[in-house]
Each structure stands twice: as C-alpha cells, then as structure tokens.
A protein has these predicted regions:
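Sec/Tat signal peptide C-region and signal peptidase I cleavage site
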Residues: 20-25
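Alpha-helical, heptad-rich or low-complexity scaffold/stalk segments
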Residues: 26, 36-126, 130, 134-135, ...
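Bacterial N-terminal signal peptides
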Residues: 12-19
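Alpha-helical tetratricopeptide repeat
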Residues: 45-55, 84-85, 155-162, 192-195, ...
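TPR-adjacent "capping" and linker segments in tetratricopeptide-repeat scaffold/adaptor proteins
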Residues: 37-48, 144-156, 183-189, 316-327
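Catalytic glycan-binding domains that act on GlcNAc-containing polysaccharides
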Residues: 77, 85-89, 98-107, 111, ...
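Bacterial N-terminal signal peptides that target proteins for export
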Residues: 2-10
C-alpha cells in the first residue's frame, strides 16, 4: 500500500517548511447531526409514569405514609418492588419488621438493593435469608490507549528540589544540581531525573542540550530511558538532525511500554525516514503505527496511508435485541426508571443485571444503555465485564441523543470528545477545583457566559446535560474566537484544558516551525499535551460513529493546521511556514 502523499511533496511534508502551491484546503465534512440510534422501548403508560414519579417524590420528601399507600396501590411488579426497597432503605424512614423484609426478598430477589435488604434482615433476626442470584465479579476489559509516564524512581525530596529549578526555567541549574547528586542516586532514579532535565532544556528551546542530556539517559535504558529517547528525537528533529531523530524515534517504537507512545515513535520515525530519503522504512513504520488503531498516531497513520481505519470497528453503532431482554426484571426496571427521570437508579439496575444475568447479554445491555441515553452506564459496560470475550469497545464511546439548551452550534462529535475525557459522561461529577458535570465547566466560567447573554445561572444546573453542554460549547466558541488561538483546533483544545493564558505564552515560546504535530508534542504541560491528542482521537472516532469524513484528520495527516469546525461541521486546514500562515 502506498502513502497517500504526492512524491513531489515528500520532503515538504516532512519538514513542513516549504511553501506549497496550495496552502488552503477546504475539507467539507457536512454536519448532519447525530446518527440515529435504535429507539428505546417504552414500558410504562401515562398513569404509571405519574404514579411512580409521585412515589419517588414522596420518598424524597420523607412523606412515608403517603409513599407506602401509593406503593401498595400501584401495579405490583419490578417497579413497585424497587420503590418499596427504596422506602425501606431510605434514611429516617420508619423501621421495617423482619416479615416485610423477608416478603420483599422472596418476591424480588433480583433487586440491586437485595444484599442491603438481606443484611438488614439478618441484623433484625432473620435466620434463613431468601436465596438471591449470585453476583459475578467483573474484570477490567481495557480502555483506549493513553500515554503515561513510568513510575517515579527518584526520592521525593531530590525530585522536588530539581523541580524548583525546572519550574523557574533554569535547566542548566537543574543539571548542575543533578550532577552534584549522582553518587546518591540509583541508576533508575538518575535516568528519570536526566529525562526531566532534558525535557526542561527542550521546552526552553535549547535543543542541543536537550539532545545531549537525553542521549545519556537513553543509553541507560529502561522505561525512563525510552522517555528520554522521545525528547532526543524531538530535539534532533528541530535541529534538522533527521538521522539522529530517526534513531531516537525508532528506539521509542521498539521499547515503548504503551501503545500510544509506541505509535508516536513509529509515526515520527516514518517522518524522519522521509526527511532522510529512506523510503524503504516509511511504509513499514506507518503500517505498524496504523495497527495501533485506537491511538492518535495510529489514526493519523491510517489516513496517511489511505487505509480504512481499523478503529472503525470501535465506532460501529450496535443494536440491542429487545426480545432477549424484555423478560428480565432489572431491564424492565431500567427502562421504566428512565421514563420517570430516575437515571441513577436505572444505572444501578442495569449494572446489577449484568452481574447476575447471562454473560452473553453483556453487549446487549450496553447497547440498551446507549438507547436509554445512559451514557456513563454504557461507558462502564465498555470497560468492565465478565471477560474480554463479552467486551464491546463501541460502548467506550457513548453517543447519547442529547441537545444543548441553545441547540447544536458546535458539532456533537467534538463536544462528546470533550465530555468523554472530562467526565466519562458522569453528569454530576465535581472536580477538586469545582468544575462540574459532563464538560467539567467551572461555575465562574458559566456565570460569566450567562451574564454576557443576560440570563440567570445556578451552579447546580450544570448537572443537567442540556445546560452543561450549552455552557461547554459556548466556552469552546469563546476560545475559538480569541486571537491567541486563531481558531486553530489544537490550540482551542489546549486552551480548554490549560486556559487561554498559557496558550498565549506558548504561541511565542514553542518553536514548532509551523508544524501542528510538533506544536502538540512541545506543549510544556504534560496533562495538556496528552489532552490535545486524546480529544482529537476521540473526535475522529466520534466522526466515524456519525459516518463523517474527517477534515481535521485529513489535514493533520498532511501536517496542516485544522481550524475549529464551523456551524455545519466543516473543517478547513491551513499550511503554516515557520510559524506563520503561508501566502496564497
């Protein structure tokens, strides 16, 4: 298979510094909205919805007699059993006698609360507890690849002192301090700290020193040596020493301990082979990178080769088989609870069913969770299960049928790419910094946006998907329009994570030579550096889920800067030469 790059442009693509005849490309992707998923089944009639909504309202308000009366009068089945369990277990509710607990356990042993009810019954003197389904232990099924640093080897005190110099942008002082501690450090700790010094030199644009210190760490081997090799490759690339860059990136490709870094090493080794006119190495490296299909560089390699991305299998929209689920009480519970807005309880019912039911229904339950817009539940099914045989990678990328309060102005693919990374689709999660909900919006940021549009705002509203998505997309639009991002998608994503001020600094501090991939890999903040690649990877997979061609993927595979998608989802790309947009 041949690279999808014209031969006349090979070196220009490698260096990203030679003017092209065409420097603007319009890659239309045509926003068509969310791919319709299989509609969720309906279980309750209008009267039943009203009844059970009122029951849960009474329990929430601690109106115990009213709740009991309504449960007794309601149709008896999974929903009434669930409500009764909630009543019995609610804080401050009247004490339940053993006979009532026994009766409920005998009638509904399948309930998510069954073990709690059994414990309560045992404490109150019930000697023979009604049998309940066995609860299966689940395993981690794996997740999307992520670039991680190895475990720290240096002592906290030495690392902390070194970090003072690094944070003060003093890599030479950091190196001197490290040299004074050589006899006190293990070989592994010394390699780790040399990597950190090399990276400090690199972000200060002292590439020769970064290459020198990094090469010593690389020679020591081990996981930190591989990290140092990555720095050596980047520094050599910026110095124009493409042969050394190839050797360093090839070392990363051979010894990286995770797929994300391995794919990066392969991709950049192919770039270096292109720059050194070694065509025999280009395609094999790219093909190996493409096999690491759920990585940022794996997707770029597939695009560069003109291959159908292997990751499309992850992006397929699965359908559930209702006929094999409709007689399961917990499934009936989940569907019914969603109909009355009790999503957390629906989540508990589906997870419990997965643990007590037929293991062959695991993917089926995941697809049902998606149809019910239980995005965090579906995400959980994609990561945990009885065995890898029952895993469904599609569930790792939920595509709920939500809509911001102001309608979609930013393509859902990009919004969900952020929600996936920010919260794993947990609607009510709050970070230590106070950021809330799906897109981890800070209440202060939302307050400012609300004030600008003359609307009221309550922090608790950020727990509502429609509200959170609205403020999230509004903030992305604001970042898009700032001069410091110029509307370039990687910079908008970086600003969403790190804030606008760091991006403003990086515009002048990062020597990327107009290369968007070099910009991404040179971001000083570890978290933001990984964040940009993860969001773009998520974005591309969501575009596959929506059956869209990807303008940003196509552009980045040609080392062009993708702009933020417009209202129709269209992405334009621009070639930048030496840090400035090339003239037409």
């Amino acid at each position: 298979m041949r690279l999808k790059i014209p031969n006349v442009h090979l070196l220009a693509v490698a260096f990203a510094c030679t003017p092209f005849a065409t420097v603007y490309a319009n890659n239309s992707v045509g926003y068509r909205g969310i791919v319709s998923v299989q509609p969720a089944p309906k279980v309750l009639n209008a009267q039943e919805k009203e009844t059970f909504a009122a029951i849960y309202a009474a329990i929430r308000s601690e109106k115990w007699e009213e709740a009991t009366r309504m449960i007794d009068a309601a149709p008896q089945g999974p929903m009434s059993a669930m409500a009764r369990a909630e009543l019995y277990l609610a804080p401050n509710s009247p004490k339940v006698d053993v006979a009532q607990l026994q009766a409920l356990l005998e009638a509904a042993p399948y309930l998510p609360q069954a073990e709690l009810l059994a414990t309560m019954a045992r404490k109150r003197g019930l000697e023979i507890i009604p049998s309940r389904p066995g609860i299966r232990r689940f395993s981690w099924l794996g997740g999307a690849p992520k670039r991680d640093l190895p475990a720290n080897k240096a002592s906290d005190s030495v690392r902390a002192k070194l970090q003072i110099f690094i944070k003060n942008d003093q890599p030479f002082a950091a190196e001197q301090f490290l040299e004074s501690k050589i006899l006190d450090l293990s070989p592994e700790a010394l390699t780790e700290l040399r990597y950190r010094v090399a990276w400090s030199y690199y972000i200060e644009n002292d590439d020769a020193s970064a290459q020198r210190v990094g090469a010593v760490a690389q020679a020591a081997g081990g996981a930190w040596g591989t990290q140092a090799s990555w720095v050596v490759g980047l520094a050599a690339w910026r110095l124009g020493d493409y042969a050394a860059a190839y050797d360093a990136f090839d070392h990363v490709a051979r010894f990286a301990g995770n797929d994300d870094l391995k794919a990066a090493g392969l991709f950049w080794a192919a770039r270096a082979a292109m720059a050194t006119q070694q065509p025999q190495f280009i395609q094999p490296k790219m093909q190996k990178a493409a096999q690491l299909s759920e990585t940022f560089y794996g997707l770029l390699a597939s695009e560069a080769l003109g291959m159908e991305p292997i990751a499309r299998s992850v992006a397929k929209v699965g359908k559930f088989d209702w006929t094999s689920l409709q007689n399961q009480p917990n499934v009936i519970l989940a569907v019914s609870l969603v109909e009355i807005g009790q999503n957390k309880r629906a989540d508990a019912a589906l997870r419990h069913q997965a643990r007590i039911g037929d293991v062959r229904q695991h993917a089926n339950l995941a697809y049902l969770a998606g149809a019910l817009n239980l995005a965090s539940t579906q995400f959980w099914f994609g990561h945990y299960g009885p065995s890898r045989d029952q895993s469904t990678s599609t569930a790792r990328y939920p595509l709920p049928n939500w809509e911001p309060t102001g309608g979609w102005r930013v393509t859902p693919s990009l919004i969900y790419a952020h929600a996936l990374q920010e919260s794993n689709f947990r609607t009510d999660v709050i970070s230590p910094a106070g950021a809330r909900g799906l897109m981890q919006v800070l209440p202060g940021t939302a307050q400012g946006l609300a004030r600008a549009r003359g609307s009221s705002f309550k922090a608790a509203d950020l727990d509502l998907p429609a509200v959170n998505l609205e403020y999230g997309q509004s903030y992305l639009e604001k970042l898009r329009d700032l001069p410091i991002t110029s509307g370039f998608l990687p910079k908008v994503i970086a600003a969403y994570n790190a804030g606008p001020s760091p991006v403003a600094r990086w515009n002048s501090e990062i020597r990327d030579n107009g290369d968007p991939l070099l910009f991404i890999e040179s971001i000083p903040f570890w978290e933001t550096r990984g964040y940009v690649a993860i969001i773009l990877r998520n974005y591309w997979i969501y575009e596959m889920r929506e059956n869209k061609p990807s303008g940003s993927l196509k552009g980045l595979a040609q080392y062009m800067w993708p702009k933020f998608p417009d209202a129709n989802g269209t992405v334009t790309t621009r070639r930048m030469i030496g840090g400035t947009i090339a003239a037409r």
